[in-house]
Amino acid sequence: MKKIILTIATAALISVNVFAADGGKKANETALNISYSVQQAFNADFSDATSVVWTVTKNVQKVDFVTFGTKKTAFYNLSGEFLGVTQYVDYNAIPAKSQKLIEEQYKGYKVGSVIVYQTNEALNNDIDQTTYFVDLKNTDHEVLVRITNSGKAEFFKQVK
């Protein structure tokens, strides 16, 4: 389960252009593939959502949407249980302690996007309830760094 959630967070970070890429066309095309229980859960969890676009994989049902002007992505397992939600945030949203660690450990890297992932702790309490993923780039490499609840900056994945 932890691996699925971390994969979800990574996929969300890498798919920066998901809203622009499909122009919202998938909303009606894939709606029939979304399980009824997931649609009901999503409507209850995010009743004010607009610009809803669903994607189904073999492990999860993902929905990109806008709520109160903020783009978010929610993830549900195939049984309809809410796994978590991601959204892009400003770099200043992560703790100052973490920013300092990133500056020390990743000199020469520039901050790209930052995603906050808020998990359904009731479903899996082995994972931090709130985790930040910071995309860092230099001329040769791109890495994802995970910021834990305790403020630790940990290498998560080599992107390039």
Q: Model features per residue range: what roles?
A:
Residues 1-25, 42:
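Bacterial Sec-dependent N-terminal signal peptides
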Residues 22-160:
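Interaction-mediating elements
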